[in-house]
Amino acid sequence: MTVELPRPWRWFRHPPGPEYRSILVVDIAGFGRWSNPHQIVARDVLTTAVRDGFRAAGVRQADLGRQDRGDGMAVLIPAHVSKVDILDPVIPELISRLRRHNATAVPRIRIRLSLHAGEVHRDAHGWVGSDLNTACRLVDAEPVRAGLLGDAVLVVSDVLYRSVVRHGYRRVDPAAFSRVEVAEKEVREPAWVAQVS
C-alpha cells in the first residue's frame, strides 16, 4: 500500500535546488550582558556597518540575503560577488565603521565574523542549509571566541583559506591567519583565524 503525502509534504521530500552563496556571519560579543537599549543601538550600528561595507564593494543591498540572529546576522551573498571583494573592501570597511562608533561609545561593540561558502536553500522562513550551519558554528567556535582580542576577529573555512586567502589578493595577508581546529556541534574541521585591522 502506498500512502500519498499531501502536497506540502511532497515539497519537503523534494525541495527546490539550492543556491550557491558566500556566507558572512557576524556576531556581537557579550551582547546578552547588555541592557535592551544598548542591544538596540548595537544592532543598528552593525546593520549600518554591514550595509556600508557592501556598498564600498558596489554590491546592491537587494542582491543580499539576510538572516537575523538576534546578536548578529548572516549575510548570504550571491556568487557573482567575488570572495576577494568580501575580504577587501567589505570586511575592512565594515570594521572601519564599527571603529568610528567605538571611538566614542561605551560599551564598545566587538564582533566575530565567519566567512564560508556553499549551497543554501531559501524558504518562506529564510535561509537553511548545512553550509550556513557551518558558517554559524565557525563564528561560535571556542578558538574564535578566544581569538577576539580587539574590535574584531575573522574566521574563514579551510576551503576558503586554500582557494582565496592563501593567495594574498589585495590587502589580504595570509600570514595574519592561524590555523585552528573547530569542534562545534556537528562541525569538526580546520579553520583559519585572524585579527581584523
Region locations from a protein language model:
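Short, surface-exposed, charged loop/turn segments at secondary-structure junctions
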Residues: 126-135, 169-171
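Short catalytic/binding micro-motifs of nucleotide second-messenger systems
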Residues: 56-58, 95-105, 141-146
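Short amphipathic alpha-helices in soluble, non-transmembrane regions
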Residues: 87-94
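Catalytic core of nucleotidyl cyclases, primarily class III adenylyl/guanylyl cyclases
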Residues: 59-83, 102-130
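Catalytic/regulatory signature loops of cyclic-dinucleotide turnover enzymes
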Residues: 134-158
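Intrinsically disordered, glycine/charged-rich C-terminal tails and inter-domain linkers
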Residues: 1-5, 151-197
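Catalytic NTP-binding/metal-coordinating core of nucleotidyl cyclase/transferase enzymes
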Residues: 2-85
